[in-house]
Design a protein with these regions (language model features):
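Long, amphipathic alpha-helical coupling/dimerization segments that relay conformational signals between
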Residues: 48-130
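N-terminal low-complexity or simple alpha-helical regulatory segments
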Residues: 1-69
Length: 131
């Protein structure tokens, strides 16, 4: 899945404009995907924990020179990659659970994006306060 995501990212000129090596570009994915998996394993109605990995990733991307638009695009590509992987493996999926899981996955990835954006905004606010 990481290789598929990276291939999509490398097709985006804006994202490629930030020169990062493999680890810098993909190192965050195992933790973000782990948070998605943890979320899928929660009982229905359980309060969703905030993704510390997403907050750290947002801060890192900001320091690496990403814009908000770039972070949103990277997150969108993660969702596309996850859903494409599910589509490729439809024969191995339990359809009765699939739709609720897709909703949970989308919600978790969006919640992670929210955490990233909060880091961007906090950094911008701190920068303004220092000015």
């Amino acid at each position: 899945m990481i290789a598929d995501w990276l291939a999509r990212v490398e097709q985006e000129p804006d994202l490629k404009s930030i020169p990062l090596n493999f680890e810098e570009r993909t190192g965050h994915l195992p933790r973000l995907l782990s948070d998605v998996i943890k979320r899928l394993r929660l009982d229905a109605g359980t309060k969703t924990p905030i993704s510390k990995a997403a907050a750290e990733h947002g801060d890192l991307r900001r320091k690496q020179g990403y814009t908000v638009v770039m972070a949103v695009e990277e997150s969108r590509l993660l969702q596309v990659t996850i859903f494409s992987t599910l589509h490729k493996n439809t024969n191995n999926l339990q359809f009765s659970a699939l739709l609720p899981d897709v909703v949970t996955i989308a919600d978790e990835v969006d919640a992670q994006l929210k955490e990233q954006m909060l880091c961007f905004m906090a950094a911008d606010a701190a920068k303004l306060a220092r000015s």
